[in-house]
Curated annotation (Swiss-Prot):
The keyword Lyase does not apply. The chain crosses the membrane at residues 23-43, 447-467. The M ring may be actively involved in energy transduction. This is Flagellar M-ring protein. It comes from Escherichia coli (strain K12). One of its GO terms (molecular function) is cytoskeletal motor activity. The gene is fliF. One of its GO terms (cellular component) is plasma membrane.
Length: 552
């Protein structure tokens, strides 16, 4: 019974609400205002960006405390666990927090040395220094774009007084990369040399770099491929430089966009060193370099015995006998000259020997070949037809093609010894197959961003229009119709009241007239009564006159 009564009361309350035309209007208006406010707040809501991620609990609490003191709105990202702030304040907040030493990071740096106590042992001091150095290196490596986190382990050998017992330090680096990111050869080399330069006596070969997947990143570049990224980039730069030179020298002749060139360069990346030693025979003795000279002279004296052919010839004195200097051939390395003089005219004998040694004409040449020398060039050039004033294409003449080919040879540095090849073709370009160039404005990212921002406000206006059209406007229409009906009813009521008032006024006038008539009759009868009392004869004459008029 109570439930039925409550249900009846609820139905009666709903019927009363439905009967009241203001209730739907109020509800629809409130809903429209709420939706509009929500959409405006959504449109004006700031775009949140990541301030810091992968923070420790200490750093996260300190950063949140500082943001609260600065009255900066922030929120936590459930997916990445990062602290997000409005996009326009990210860089400012990072600088302000960095000024306060936040975040400190999971690894401690040189601030660990600020907490050393007095009387600490040398071993503990060395361990703290090594920990601080590892932490600073980890922080530095984490500043590289693809690196999400890093850890560094240093193996520092104990110094020794003996040279043969000294060992080089080594380092192991583990990097945690961002999803979908990787380190290229240049970044790997940069990390290796960064660690090597930060530790005294650490050669780059003793640095090992490993990613979170356990992949060794510091393996030799030639262990799995012939060319590394640096060599490929160098080859691409060489080809691009030659291509730009060809297009730059031919564009003023045939016009911009009327020439396309492709260059293929074969480069030699082998590291070569050559040592050459040459020996040549000595030239003129006057220009030869004297290395050493030895001179021997001997003299003998004694009795001489006569000899010779008997006769007159033997009685003649013998002429002076000079021993000639014998010179070996010029192509010998050691030259020897001997001079001997013997006198048979008496007991005296003299001998002279001279030996000269000259330097060997030797040439030693050590040549280190350049890495990346061009071994061969292959160039292909396509030149468009020239366009006549009437719009018709016309091929270039043989002289023009010969001129273009000669200019291309000079621009590319053509060498027959190297085996270079060049092919120049004159062909009409297909204008419908144009590629490259600047993207249309509707495909540019700036236009897309502006379109998205405008679309957000357009969505707000569209929802507002739909609310006005479907919710607010019908209620206002019904409200206006109800007000009009009420006004019509009021006007009809006023007309009825006016008619009633008019009718009432007529009745009142009739009653007033009747009252006046009654009052006039009473006054007349009173006057007649007074007149009959005062002058009965006049009254009798009046009555006689009335009677006569009635008979007539």
């Amino acid at each position: 019974m109570n439930a039925t009564a409550a249900q009846t009361k609820s139905l009666e309350w709903l019927n009363r609400l439905r009967a009241n035309p203001k209730i739907p209007l109020i509800v629809a208006g409130s809903a429209a205002v709420a939706v509009m406010v929500a959409l405006i707040l959504w449109a004006k809501a700031p775009d949140y960006r990541t301030l810091f991620s992968n923070l420790s609990d200490q750093d996260g609490g300190a950063i949140v405390s500082q943001l609260t003191q600065m009255n900066i709105p922030y929120r936590f990202s459930e997916a990445s666990g990062a602290i997000e702030v409005p996009a326009d304040k990210v860089h400012e907040l990072r600088l302000r927090l960095a000024q306060q030493g936040l975040p400190k990071g999971g690894a401690v740096g040189f601030e660990l040395l600020d907490q050393e106590k007095f009387g600490i042992s040398q071993f503990s001091e060395q361990v703290n220094y090594q920990r601080a150095l590892e932490g600073e290196l980890s922080r530095t490596i984490e500043t590289i774009g693809p690196v999400k986190g890093a850890r560094v382990h240093l193996a520092m050998p104990k110094p020794s007084l003996f040279v043969r017992e000294q060992k080089s330090p080594s380092a192991s680096v583990t990097v945690n990369l961002l999803p979908g990111r990787a380190l290229d050869e240049g970044q790997i080399s940069a990390i290796v040399h960064l660690v090597s330069s930060a530790v005294a006596g650490l050669p780059p070969g003793n640095v090992t770099l490993v990613d979170q997947g356990g992949h060794l990143l510091t393996q030799s570049n030639t262990s799995g491929r012939d060319l590394n990224d640096a060599q490929l980039k160098y080859a691409s730069d060489v080809e691009g430089r030659i291509q730009r030179r060809i297009e730059a020298i031919l564009s003023p002749i045939v016009g911009n966009g009327n020439i396309h060139a492709q260059v293929t360069a074969q480069l030699d990346f082998a590291s070569k060193e050559q040592t050459e030693e040459q020996y040549r025979p000595n030239g003129d003795e006057s220009h030869a370099a004297l290395r050493s000279r030895q001179l021997n002279e001997s003299e003998q004296s004694g009795s001489g015995y006569p000899g010779g052919v008997p006769g007159a010839l033997s009685n003649q004195p013998a002429p002076a006998n000079n021993a000639p200097i014998s010179t070996p051939p010029a192509n010998q390395n050691n030259r020897q000259q001997q001079a001997s003089t013997t006198s048979n005219s008496g007991p005296r004998s003299t001998q002279r020997n001279e030996t000269s040694n000259y330097e060997v004409d030797r040439t030693i040449r050590h040549t280190k070949m350049n890495v990346g020398d061009v071994q061969r060039l292959s160039v292909a050039v396509v030149v468009n037809y020239k366009t006549l004033p009437d719009g018709k294409p016309l091929p270039l003449s043989n002289e023009q093609m010969k001129q273009i080919e000669d200019l291309t040879r000079e621009a590319m540095g053509f060498s027959e010894k190297r085996g270079d090849s060049l092919n120049v073709v004159n062909s009409p370009f297909n204008s419908s197959d144009e590629s490259g160039g600047e993207l249309p404005f509707w495909q540019q990212q700036a236009f897309i961003d502006q379109l998205l921002a405008a679309g957000r406000w357009l969505l707000v206006l569209l929802v507002a229009w739909l609310l006005w059209r479907k919710a607010v406007r019908p209620q206002l229409t019904r409200r206006a119709e109800a007000m009009k009906a009420v006004q019509q009813q009021a006007q009809a009521r006023e007309e009825v009241e006016d008619a009633v008032e008019v009718r009432l006024s007529k009745d009142e006038q009739l009653q007033q007239r009747r009252a006046n008539q009654r009052l006039g009759a009473e006054v007349m009868s009173q006057r007649i009564r007074e007149m009959s009392d005062n002058d009965p004869r006049v009254v009798a004459l009046v009555i006689r006159q009335w009677i006569n008029n009635d008979h007539e």
